[in-house]
């Protein structure tokens, strides 16, 4: 196996429980969206996001009320729309900064990320959530501030997560051959795309025992990845 020089990790279902995203973050943003838009409609960033949402939704001349209904409909559909992601990220930022929200990170993931960072591995995040939201979840986590572990964050602006070209672009951005990058995710479609780009990849399956390591390869946790591959460790 080619030596690993960098690790790219997904968030939802990989470093973070699915329930945190769907049962904590999404409802938190939904409950506060109307008040946030009303209070910040004149903010340049918010106004731009609302305008982008209208254009994307085909309601260019709509007011804030109709735009709000569009955004709520996108939430119901779990649509990965850029303007929605930006607004959610801004709402979450307030929650994190006020101490109301804490990013939930699996303890094994936090321990491995710190170990790998200390070992000199370059660490990156690739998630459908916005870059800002990614920084918040790791920077204000229940495992402490993991932000210093990461060199960079990628969201869907670099491409779809099931498109192999996205992974090639991430490796190119890092200045590394894809074969020297290890990608971790719970999503088989993403794993397939990463491998098609030439990356090494391991499926994280949280339904398995923590130390499980199976053909695929598939691991029950980050600690299982460390035990099986010891990425970045000198021979």
Curated annotation (Swiss-Prot):
Its EC number is 3.1.3.77. Pfam families: Hydrolase. The keyword Magnesium applies. InterPro entries: Enolase-ppase_E1, HAD-like_sf, HAD-SF_hydro_IA, HAD_sf. It comes from the Bacteria. One of its GO terms (biological process) is L-methionine salvage from methylthioadenosine. One of its GO terms (molecular function) is 2,3-diketo-5-methylthiopentyl-1-phosphate enolase activity. It is an enzyme of class 3 (hydrolase). It catalyses: 5-methylsulfanyl-2,3-dioxopentyl phosphate + H2O = 1,2-dihydroxy-5-(methylsulfanyl)pent-1-en-3-one + phosphate. Pathway: Amino-acid biosynthesis; L-methionine biosynthesis via salvage pathway; L-methionine from S-methyl-5-thio-alpha-D-ribose 1-phosphate: step 3/6; Amino-acid biosynthesis; L-methionine biosynthesis via salvage pathway; L-methionine from S-methyl-5-thio-alpha-D-ribose 1-phosphate: step 4/6. Its cofactor is Mg(2+). Binds 1 Mg(2+) ion per subunit. Keywords: Amino-acid biosynthesis, Hydrolase, Magnesium, Metal-binding, Methionine biosynthesis. PANTHER family: ENOLASE-PHOSPHATASE E1 (PTHR20371:SF1). Monomer. Bifunctional enzyme that catalyzes the enolization of 2,3-diketo-5-methylthiopentyl-1-phosphate (DK-MTP-1-P) into the intermediate 2-hydroxy-3-keto-5-methylthiopentenyl-1-phosphate (HK-MTPenyl-1-P), which is then dephosphorylated to form the acireductone 1,2-dihydroxy-3-keto-5-methylthiopentene (DHK-MTPene). Belongs to the HAD-like hydrolase superfamily. MasA/MtnC family. This is Enolase-phosphatase E1. It comes from Parvibaculum lavamentivorans (strain DS-1 / DSM 13023 / NCIMB 13966).
């Amino acid at each position: 196996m080619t030596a690993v020089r960098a690790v790219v990790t997904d968030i939802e279902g990989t470093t973070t429980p699915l329930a945190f995203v769907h049962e904590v973050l999404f409802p938190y943003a939904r409950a506060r969206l109307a008040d946030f838009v009303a209070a910040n409609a004149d903010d340049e960033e918010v106004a731009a996001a609302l305008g982008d949402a209208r254009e994307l939704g085909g309601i260019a001349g709509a007011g804030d009320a109709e735009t709000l209904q569009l955004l709520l409909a996108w939430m119901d559909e779990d649509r990965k729309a850029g303007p929605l992601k930006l607004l959610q990220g801004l709402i979450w930022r307030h929650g994190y900064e006020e101490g109301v929200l804490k990013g939930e990170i699996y303890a094994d993931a936090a321990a491995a990320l710190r170990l790998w960072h200390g070992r000199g591995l370059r660490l990156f995040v690739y998630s459908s959530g916005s870059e800002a939201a990614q920084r918040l979840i790791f920077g204000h986590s229940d495992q402490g501030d993991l932000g210093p572990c990461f060199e960079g964050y990628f969201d869907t602006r670099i491409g779809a997560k099931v498109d192999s070209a996205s992974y090639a672009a991430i490796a190119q951005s890092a200045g590394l051959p894809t074969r020297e990058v290890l990608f971790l995710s719970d999503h088989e479609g993403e794993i397939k795309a990463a491998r098609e780009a030439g990356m090494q990849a391991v499926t994280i399956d949280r339904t398995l025992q923590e130390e499980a390591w199976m053909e695929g390869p598939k691991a029950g946790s980050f600690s299982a990845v460390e035990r099986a591959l010891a990425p970045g460790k000198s021979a």
